[in-house]
């Protein structure tokens, strides 16, 4: 997954983060100090391509948030694949968004941030099942944040053990755990 760092997206705050925990520079500035700030006129897409080239990355997956991802994928389809970002709190809208973006933009994946939703939506919550079923139907992998979240939000919705039931109920679902599943890496590998 690749994110475009630009002045508009550099201080994204998930809706579940309390006001006092939103940070001055970014949502995790209590852990990460002196993070560079992108200027308005920086070309985030070209900088990303340059960084990909420098690191031997041929193609990258970008989430359809803001305008940069779609612009990048349309201008450089050989370099960028698109991913739909959904909030399971509105189940039918999430399913429709997956279908619409897959048809219009040929998205290659779906993602959601369980502890970033407001209210939180656990990995194994009933609201996620229509999303998983749609991913199986369209042959799309789903990227789900797993383990302790970076922002100061409650992490139970992302507990790695919650994948067990989902894996059992959806044997054909391709799941990609994001953010390392820490501190339950061994459990993640077993699942």
Residue ranges and their predicted role:
Residues 1-4, 145, 179:
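Histidine-centered divalent metal-coordination motifs
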Residues 1-59:
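An N-terminally biased module of ancient metal coordination in phosphate/nucleic-acid-related enzymes
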Residues 49, 98-99, 132, 164, ...:
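Short hydrophobic/charged patches on amphipathic alpha-helices used for structural packing
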Residues 50-58, 76, 137-138, 169-175:
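A structural motif corresponding to the C-terminal end of an alpha-helix
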Residues 59, 65-158:
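Active-site gating/metal-coordination segments in enzymes
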Residues 103-108, 160-175:
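Structural recognition of alpha->loop->beta junctions
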Residues 157-167, 186-191:
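Short loop-to-alpha-helix "cap/lid" segments that border enzyme active sites
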Residues 174-191:
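H/E-rich (His + Asp/Glu) clusters that bind or coordinate divalent metals
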